[in-house]
Amino acid sequence: MILTTTNTIEGHTITAYKGIVVGEAIMGANIVRDFFASVTDVIGGRSGAYEDKLQDARTEAMAEIEERAAALGANAVVGIDLDYEVTGDSMLMVSVSGTAVTIT
């Protein structure tokens, strides 16, 4: 399965549009990690704990659109858009959407 943010795939022709596919992942962060992340923010640097959570959420959401596209008989997803949002209570939401297509 090819997943891309572009609307076309070089070297391939889109033969059928199967529909819009969406995947979401909501991840919570725990209090200990929040504390250490805030310490990192104060002294500078990157928060590895949050980066790991972000990667996990993104991977889960991408896997969802891949599964949903396959269920529609697609072999690619084009025009992928990723959105990130931090909600209350230390929740991180990643939503991914794209168009499931069949390519040759």
Swiss-Prot record:
It comes from Roseobacter denitrificans (strain ATCC 33942 / OCh 114) (Erythrobacter sp. (strain OCh 114)). Pfam families: YbjQ_1 (PF01906). This is UPF0145 protein RD1_2695. Gene3D superfamilies: Hypothetical protein apc22750. Chain B. SUPFAM superfamilies: YbjQ-like. InterPro entries: UPF0145_dom_sf, UPF0145_YbjQ-like. Belongs to the UPF0145 family. It comes from the Bacteria.
